[in-house]
């Protein structure tokens, strides 16, 4: 099982196939995705890779994290995420994973945080039909109606759908097709929509319900760490 990647959602556009058919795609950008740490079975009880993406200012990074970045000889990162992997898919600390980690035609699962919409009513939040427009209904046309019976059941059940905060939820969209990959610019074009606002962080993984294509690199598309990479300053 390979590692996933951290990317930023740039927005949506469309590309054309050789047959002239247009395909709506979401553009995802990789921002210096590097391996920051390894988790091993002997030391941690499980196997995983901690990846970092984006460049953070040193003054905004906690001292403990600055020391961690310094040991890994990587610049401070804005986003840190762990991906579970098999022992044979571990990648050396400091290595950069490039966009050709995923190949065109491959299916991926993408996880993002939905756009926040604040406090909304049940009609918008849960697609309720609302109450009647007339015949005794006043003011409460868009309410959710009764929440529980009188004597029976005499209570409101847990998880009753009501008005409340809508959005800012972690959502995974499965089986999205990779349309194009641009290694030089670090772009991955995925067919369809992905949850989240422009500039938001998303996680890309190999689709769990699809077979990994033969051309996919294993353990990943790796760019070796540069010897002169500036590390975080301790202190």
From Swiss-Prot:
Entry keyword rRNA-binding: yes
Post-translational modification: Methylated by PrmB.
Region (Disordered): 138-157
SUPFAM superfamilies attached to this UniProt entry: Translation proteins
PROSITE patterns in the record: RIBOSOMAL_L3 (PS00474)
Modified residues (N5-methylglutamine): 151
UniProt keyword annotations, A-Z: Methylation, Ribonucleoprotein, Ribosomal protein, RNA-binding, rRNA-binding
GO biological processes: translation
InterPro entries on file: Ribosomal_uL3, Ribosomal_uL3_bac/org-type, Ribosomal_uL3_CS, Transl_B-barrel_sf
Membrane-spanning parts: none
Cellular component terms per the entry's GO annotation: cytosolic large ribosomal subunit
Gene Ontology molecular function: rRNA binding; structural constituent of ribosome
SUBUNIT field: Part of the 50S ribosomal subunit. Forms a cluster with proteins L14 and L19.
Function: One of the primary rRNA binding proteins, it binds directly near the 3'-end of the 23S rRNA, where it nucleates assembly of the 50S subunit.
Family, per entry: Belongs to the universal ribosomal protein uL3 family.
The protein's name in its UniProt record: Large ribosomal subunit protein uL3
Species whose genome carries this gene: Rhodospirillum centenum (strain ATCC 51521 / SW)
